[in-house]
Amino acid sequence: MSRVCELTNRKKSFGNKVSHSNRKTKRTFLLNLHKVTLTSDILNKKFRFRVATRTLRTIDYKGDLDAFLLNTRTIKLSEKAQKIKRRLKKVLVKQEVELAVSDA
């Protein structure tokens, strides 16, 4: 398994390790990944992801998985997350149509 966040596609980054004498050597910064199960309230489904803690904090800040996906630009999401976002939008449109029909 590669060390990639399955929601945001974030990967390891590169930089320099700087010693006390200011010598610089190449190093990598790995993501802090966790296996989590996130629930979509709109779809009534559970999804399993390997997610970076930074992404988990953002999801917590936004409220839930649905709010995170709907408020995040599609370009920044992975393919798996984009598919879920499309399904969310379809369900929301369907609910709006049903509300409009029932009101009329």
Curated annotation (Swiss-Prot):
InterPro entries per the UniProt record, alphabetical: Ribosomal_bL28 (IPR026569), Ribosomal_bL28/bL31-like_sf (IPR034704), Ribosomal_bL28_bact-type (IPR001383), Ribosomal_bL28_sf (IPR037147)
Keywords, sorted A to Z: Ribonucleoprotein, Ribosomal protein
Lineage: superkingdom: Bacteria
UniProt-recorded name of the protein: Large ribosomal subunit protein bL28
Cited Pfam families: Ribosomal_L28
GO BP annotation list: translation
Protein family per UniProt: Belongs to the bacterial ribosomal protein bL28 family.
Species: Wolbachia pipientis wMel
Signal peptide as annotated in the record: none
CC annotations in GO: cytosolic large ribosomal subunit
GO molecular function, one term: structural constituent of ribosome
